[in-house]
Amino acid sequence: MKIKMGKMYKYFLKGEEPMKHLKYLLLLVMIISIVLSFSGCSFRFSSFDSLLRPPKLSGEYQGLQDSFEKLVDKDYSLSTPENGLYRSAFIVYDFDKDKSLEAIVFYTEKKKPDLVKFYYFESKDGAFTPVASYDGLGSSVDEVKIADLNRDGKFEIIIGWNLFSSKTNKAFAVYDISSGNLKLLSSFPYSYLDIIDVNGDGIDDIFAMSVDSSVSDHYTSAATAYTYDAKTSSLQVLSTVKTDGNISSYADITVEKVDDTRLIYVEAYKGENDMITEVIYWDDNINALVSPLFDVSTQTTTQTLRHMKLSCRDIDNDGFIEIPVSVDMNGSSIVDNSAPQTLLTASADNTVNQTKSLYYTKWVKFRDDKLRAVQYSVIDENGGYVLNIPSSWVGRITVLGNDGQWDFYRWESYDEKLGKLLFSINYYDKNDSTLKQKYKNTKLLASYSSTDYVYTITEDGEYFGVTDDILTSNFNTTVLGGKK
């Protein structure tokens, strides 16, 4: 079976017909092999040589695998890229733009199980012909990207290699195809990368984030742009800038053009639940990358810290990206679903849920090297909804919440105490008749999948300024995808 995705083709591996007397056993083996091939794991065919031959590529590309298997030892494993667009051990593409296909196949051999190798094939007269085999730089493949970095009209192949299964320590290699075979141009360490025209000259560059864990007392990190240098026929560092090194992994890179500036938003995790966004751009005045939110004195980026797994996005539908930032909400207390479900109280007969403080989420735009607030929200991660609130409510309301119900109270900041109940938001399974009866006197906020979200406003809430329109027009379940 062939699936077309743009210009790229991905292939599913399909098993041979099993013998009748091993019907059920072989069916189980085939299911396991398919699951493993999709999960980014290597699958060692020789373990099942006595039962069935290696699964075959289907259709016109079956000859590619036949040719490949004649070149390698019988005992081999296919190695599938773990991330990115290309998620098959067999990648077929017109890399050199000559209107005929080429292919690369990632694999490991029994004698060198910690080294991924790859074969390069060209297609001639409808058949794939092997060109050469190459040693990779790591124990598995992180991802594969393509880009015309040297402007010769042909794509270079960028392969990211994992070094001993580390989340941050990797190396990418750039291979040129113009001579008819693959030539290694350059390789550099990285933790996360993307293809971006960093300085706006019309030529793609490699933009990479890298964490250096060799420093004994703290990690350091940097954003680096690599560009092709015609004099040396290799990649050279265009510019590099320091970033927060106290991160556990990178999540995503997003590029936004504002006026004549390309803003690069780098999402990073700090531990299990905290995130930051680095904002990096090319400064034409100094011809270099800059990271204005990075605090040199503390070696951290704290201005975009939030205590939840939430990435930047266009929250107000104005066509531009906003960054979420956590702001303390005094007096708040909600059930902590990331903690153990219950704790024993002083009385052994009772148990209570662990709780945690809630935060307002401030959505900010990056303009003129500063962050400007454009929206405030209260976010229920477990309930899967976002409630945008007027900025005048910040510091004046707080939340007490259990699973399925959040109560919004007036916060008396002068006395630092809980005030009157203003409104409540509940959610429940719309197919549960008992709960539907319980909430029959509430008003509907939204329905998402099998969940109904409802609300009630108290007289004190109406006096405070809470209205039906404020709640219904600012309630959103699509950002988080509804109840978890």
Please report, for each region that a protein language model flagged, where it lies by residue.
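Secondary-structure transition/turn motif
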Residues: 268-269, 326-328, 409-416, 457-462
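Secretory pathway targeting signatures of secreted, lumenal, and periplasmic proteins
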Residues: 392-440, 444-445
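Sec-dependent N-terminal signal peptides of Gram-positive bacterial secreted proteins and lipoproteins
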Residues: 19-46
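Short, Lys/Arg-enriched N-terminal segments with co-localized hydrophobic residues
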Residues: 1-18
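Surface-exposed amphipathic alpha-helical segments
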Residues: 455-484
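Generic recognition of long tandem-repeat/solenoid scaffolds
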Residues: 206, 264, 387, 404-413, ...
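Beta-propeller-forming repeat regions
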Residues: 38-398, 446-448, 481-484
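Extracytosolic low-complexity repeat regions of secreted or lipid-anchored proteins
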Residues: 331-334, 435-466
